[in-house]
Amino acid sequence: MTNGGGGNNGAANRTEELQPHPVKEQLPGIQYCVNSPPPWLEAVVLGFQHYLLSLGITVLIPSVLVPLMGGGYAEKVKVIQTLLFVSGLTTLFQSFFGTRLPVIAVASYAYIIPITSIIYSTRFTYYTDPFERFVRTMRSIQGALIITGCFQVLICILGVWRNIVRFLSPLSIAPLATFTGLGLYHIGFPLLARCVEVGLPGLILLIFVTQYLPRFLKMKKGVMILDGSRCDRYGMILCIPLVWLFAQLLTSSGVYDHKSHTTQTSCRTDRTGLITNTPWIYIPYPFQWGSPTFDITDSFAMMAASFVTLFESTGLFYASARYGSATPIPPSVVSRGTCWLGVGVLLNGMLGGITGITTSTENVGLLAMTKIGSRRVIQISAAFMIFFSIFGKFGAFFASIPLPIMASLYCIVLCFVSSVGLSYLQFCNLNSFNIKFILGFSFFMAISIPQYFREYYNGGWRSDHHSNWLEDMIRVIFMSHTTVAAIIAIVLDCTLCRDSDEAKKDCGMKWWDKFRLYNLDVRNDEFYGLPCRLNKFFPSH
């Protein structure tokens, strides 16, 4: 007997209605989260990858600034070793007593403008001996860094930064975290193109190994010939030596013998002067260049740079929490982490590390590429940093990797950092015109405003004008894509999206409320709790 009508057949044939992708408070797909360490051998290899990646910025900034100060290869080597030593110490402090997230502390670009102003100050033009000018300039930079480090520690201890971070919502975090990656576009392809014959093959090889090779390893019906996850997990350690060897072959064959000085510096594997000038053993010690000198006008611009690194590090803390498969980091823990970064700035000022300390954007991207967000991996990486800063000959060998090769890796890892900010938009209502305006305006102005200041000061309009401390403060803040994006997004978010329950829901604030205080989510202790029951003595609120 057949059923009458077609209603039942229609119901049986009706396809399941498509639903949006579900919201995920913790990112799935991470193979080892913050507090789940991989096996020791694997952790050592992964930690070494993070160490290699941190070398790029550690070598780049002293290589630019030390010659301007009058220093030679010997001075540059000592500054690099000191910077690496302080970065390793600060990373350990951060992983044990700070945010406890898998982040690495490295040299900051934000301090370059105030440091350059100190270098070109007229009070150092009277020194004809290059070494004497280097020492005098370094002492002045150290004094400014010491004051800046104390300033950063103070505003974090007093809870000022914690209260600022509490104004954040998923809507304002999106541009903040996104531009921590996008804002470093100048160390991507522009740096790679300085030696395109080694940089471009490196980029292509990395993309193939990490993205396409796992697909080729699959047989029919999804059976793997080899574990494809190993490709992205160890893609860096597989590709960088191959491209480095290719660069060595080009150097040995005389390809660059008659090229320009700039090309040889970027492409040759024997032009850094690090290996020959690095001592076998060197331990950085306080005030190795003499007693610091203090000038309050130098410190003002440095404090502005510290303000910029606070925004950058905050965005990267949220990014690393995402890639570590942790819950969103509470504001009190953010303040705790930035306080330890201030300690790193203070240590750099005491030891002579030439610049301030911030969270490494590149290493956060490597968390995503490897899908390993373990805290132990970062602690091992910090141990590598300290070891190779003391036993310098070994570290100098790895630091001699040409920067265009490192730039090929930056093009990969920075894209992951840029995209993690966009993932916070899953908590927002993207059909709201208010949300569309805030997002679009903050993104557009974060590109447009820094470009205006870059043209205004470097494009010839004011290129012959010696800037003062106030102009340096303005330049540092408004030439930072991350800071501009964060300020605009926070102001618009707080003034346009907090006046009703519906508006708060649109910007994600309703979902965000349970993460604004440490004790409102029981999972926070799992990821952010201090060791040895220190939470009893240093409670988070």
UniProtKB/Swiss-Prot annotation:
It is a multi-pass membrane protein. The keyword Cytoplasm does not apply. It comes from the Eukaryota. Keywords: Membrane, Transmembrane, Transmembrane helix, Transport. One of its GO terms (molecular function) is transmembrane transporter activity. It is found in: Membrane. The chain crosses the membrane at residues 52-72, 79-99, 101-121, 141-161, 173-193, 196-216, 235-255, 299-319, 376-396, 397-417, 433-453, 476-496. GO terms for cellular component: membrane. Belongs to the nucleobase:cation symporter-2 (NCS2) (TC 2.A.40) family. PANTHER family: XANTHINE-URACIL / VITAMIN C PERMEASE FAMILY MEMBER. This is Putative nucleobase-ascorbate transporter 10. It comes from Arabidopsis thaliana (Mouse-ear cress).
